Amino acid sequence: MSKVMIFLIKFYQKAISPYLGQGKCKYYPTCSQYALEAFKKKPFFKALGLTIWRILRCNPFSKGGYDPLK
């Protein structure tokens, strides 16, 4: 299942994200890169939870900044 998510994230990064413009994510690494690392390094459900939590935190009220995968 993680391989499917990795494929979908890479597809998003290459086919969709470039058309959204630069600098849309408040975090470093970007939310999609964070998710990609999570699905490569963590069990599926842990990675899914981390990814959802990260996306929920990426909003106009968040200050963003450096937030690496732990």
Curated annotation (Swiss-Prot):
The record lists the organism as Finegoldia magna (strain ATCC 29328 / DSM 20472 / WAL 2508)
Q: Which SMART domains match?
A: Haemolytic
Where in the cell? Answer: Cell membrane
Membrane topology recorded in Swiss-Prot or TrEMBL: Peripheral membrane protein
**Family statement drawn from the similarity comment of this UniProt entry:** Belongs to the UPF0161 family.
Q: Name one GO cellular component term.
A: plasma membrane
**UniProt keyword list:** Cell membrane, Membrane
Q: What is this protein called?
A: Putative membrane protein insertion efficiency factor
